[in-house]
């Protein structure tokens, strides 16, 4: 029988803890969010984050970039926020407008304000397993918290991460490696027969490539833990990268879409923000 990993329930607990921590701060906890207002998905996500932040007592400053924004102008904006003592954390909501070099923007965020852990300094510390005073990218850290909540062991397990983005795949690989899993990083261009062989041997599968039903139940090892980071819309409904129905009865644990990783990402981002406030009071 497949057990559902309830991200909503775990996120609720995290949010309650975050709210209590925010209440103890002497100064307002403020998250600046830079985003492209022409992207409907970004507008949706920014709105969701802002509403949840307000419930926890976190102030958000949503900053839409103009249609004529350049990499240089966005970096200048980030540097101004770095110097603004009223700003606790900074989030750069991806994707930004075409032509803007996102990695340069991520790395312009000061490490002590990097709420989503996407800058080169923070990600370098993550790969060096030296993250004592830094936050981790919210989605992969949320996955790790969810696994821990369900007491899913990682030590010595074969794990496959499908997706290599800076937001998800690369930090996910590092976190699982640091937790003593044996990790393989695959992606949408991995040769299909190679990917199928990897999946059949994987105790842990974490996938986020943005392709609906990219992985089928028949691809999975019996009893595997399957974490679906994908969020796609098919016929007006949210759909993950894993064919959920076909994985039933094969996976030991699985996250639903929606209600799995999504709530954990937002909860972890806001948890990261109050952590930054505590570290730099």
Curated annotation (Swiss-Prot):
The enzyme's E.C. designation? 1.5.1.5, 3.5.4.9
The domain of life for this entry's organism is Bacteria
Which residues are noted in the entry as NADP(+)-binding?
163-165
One family name in Pfam for this protein: THF_DHG_CYH_C
Q: Which UniProt keywords apply?
A: Amino-acid biosynthesis, Histidine biosynthesis, Hydrolase, Methionine biosynthesis, Multifunctional enzyme, NADP, One-carbon metabolism, Oxidoreductase, Purine biosynthesis
- Tell me the route in metabolism or biology where this protein functions: One-carbon metabolism; tetrahydrofolate interconversion
**Which CDD domains does the UniProt entry name for this protein?**
NAD_bind_m-THF_DH_Cyclohyd
Catalytic reactions on record: (6R)-5,10-methylene-5,6,7,8-tetrahydrofolate + NADP(+) = (6R)-5,10-methenyltetrahydrofolate + NADPH; (6R)-5,10-methenyltetrahydrofolate + H2O = (6R)-10-formyltetrahydrofolate + H(+)
What the entry lists under Gene3D superfamilies is as follows:
Leucine Dehydrogenase, chain A, domain 1, NAD(P)-binding Rossmann-like Domain
* Entry GO CC: cytosol
Cite the SUPFAM superfamilies for this sequence. Answer: Aminoacid dehydrogenase-like, N-terminal domain, NAD(P)-binding Rossmann-fold domains
Gene Ontology terms: biological process: L-histidine biosynthetic process; methionine biosynthetic process; purine nucleotide biosynthetic process; tetrahydrofolate interconversion
UniProt-listed InterPro entries: Aminoacid_DH-like_N_sf, NAD(P)-bd_dom_sf, THF_DH/CycHdrlase, THF_DH/CycHdrlase_cat_dom, THF_DH/CycHdrlase_CS, THF_DH/CycHdrlase_NAD-bd_dom
| GO MF annotation terms | methenyltetrahydrofolate cyclohydrolase activity; methylenetetrahydrofolate dehydrogenase (NADP+) activity
For this chain, the family text in UniProt reads: Belongs to the tetrahydrofolate dehydrogenase/cyclohydrolase family.
Q: Fill in the subunit field for this protein.
A: Homodimer.
Which purpose does this protein serve, as stated in its record? Catalyzes the oxidation of 5,10-methylenetetrahydrofolate to 5,10-methenyltetrahydrofolate and then the hydrolysis of 5,10-methenyltetrahydrofolate to 10-formyltetrahydrofolate.
Q: What is this protein called?
A: Bifunctional protein FolD
| Organism the protein comes from | Leuconostoc mesenteroides subsp. mesenteroides (strain ATCC 8293 / DSM 20343 / BCRC 11652 / CCM 1803 / JCM 6124 / NCDO 523 / NBRC 100496 / NCIMB 8023 / NCTC 12954 / NRRL B-1118 / 37Y)
